[in-house]
Amino acid sequence: MFTSTGSSGLYKAPLSKSLLLVPSALSLLLALLLPHCQKLFVYDLHAVKNDFQIWRLICGRIICLDLKDTFCSSLLIYNFRIFERRYGSRKFASFLLGSWVLSALFDFLLIEAMQYFFGITAASNLPSGFLAPVFALFVPFYCSIPRVQVAQILGPLSITNKTLIYILGLQLFTSGSYIWIVAISGLMSGLCYDSKMFQVHQVLCIPSWMAKFFSWTLEPIFSSSEPTSEARIGMGATLDIQRQQRMELLDRQLMFSQFAQGRRQRQQQGGMINWNRLFPPLRQRQNVNYQGGRQSEPAAPPLEVSEEQVARLMEMGFSRGDALEALRASNNDLNVATNFLLQH
């Protein structure tokens, strides 16, 4: 929607699809047909602490009672489906589970801190819904998704491929009085889980037997078919020319982004990716349709690509041709090729 992910829709993202459909349907059902049942899904930490209503930690943190929160969180989950394609459904579910559990602890700590330092007790009634894991996903989104400048406005300000996602997150952040507590808890839990602090990723994870069980039972229900008609960039006469145009377009975007930010291209070992080293063949390749009488340069022998890495990229939802092009351009670096494809 806002970020390009290689293929549209929810292909290879059954968990994201279930998180879009089930909570949204239940939220609409409670708002339109069963408003008298909404009290059962109120996220009331005061009732949890004083009345030992532990079940509210589950019911109050799954379904949104505010429809605009449902809409914003659904849009964010749709865009964050790229992590399910990258990590796989089991690791993605483990991240959501870990951040969901940790955020409940951080909610309690923040509420107690507000009551102790500021005497604010009304904050014990927090917004309901699956919101904290959505905010937690901003941590890997910020750290692992490359920033590509799309346009520049008002001098130093620029619009990137990530700008609209941050704006949508800000809209969700400001949608309620105390939702900032849930947002901070989600960001803290995402940071703890993503950085593997205290080995929480090994404790709060989905067991393999459970992942297999759900893959046999629920995954066929929420799985989506592979898109057959993708809109292609460029007007090349053949698929090879179209793929070449797509690669060259992304190369130009990356170069423009680095130029606008004032970065100088230099080779570093173990540091930032040197795009001039990875992508010069894309700019130097010339097709017979665009030569205009000039002689083409001698073609370099094709780089051998690992079939295992091609298979992993295809499991994320990318086509075989795009996976081969990205792996050749990135010198068989799977991480660079994945980030490359996620931006196109």
From Swiss-Prot:
Name by which UniProt lists this protein: Ubiquitin-associated domain-containing protein 2
CC annotations in GO: endoplasmic reticulum; endoplasmic reticulum membrane
Organism: Homo sapiens (Human)
Subcellular location: Endoplasmic reticulum membrane
Ranges per topology, Extracellular: 36-91, 147-163
Residue intervals of the UBA domain: 304-344
BP term (GO), one: Wnt signaling pathway
Cytoplasmic membrane side: 113-125, 185-344
Membrane protein topology class: Multi-pass membrane protein
Entry keyword annotation includes Glycoprotein: yes
Record bears the keyword Membrane: yes
Source taxon at top rank: Eukaryota
Keywords, sorted A to Z: Endoplasmic reticulum, Glycoprotein, Membrane, Signal, Transmembrane, Transmembrane helix, Wnt signaling pathway
Glycan attachment residues as annotated in the record: N161
GO MF assignments: serine-type endopeptidase activity
Signal peptide positions (record): 1-35
Major subcellular site: endoplasmic reticulum
InterPro entries in the record: Rhomboid-like_sf, UBA, UBA-like_sf, UBA_UBAC2
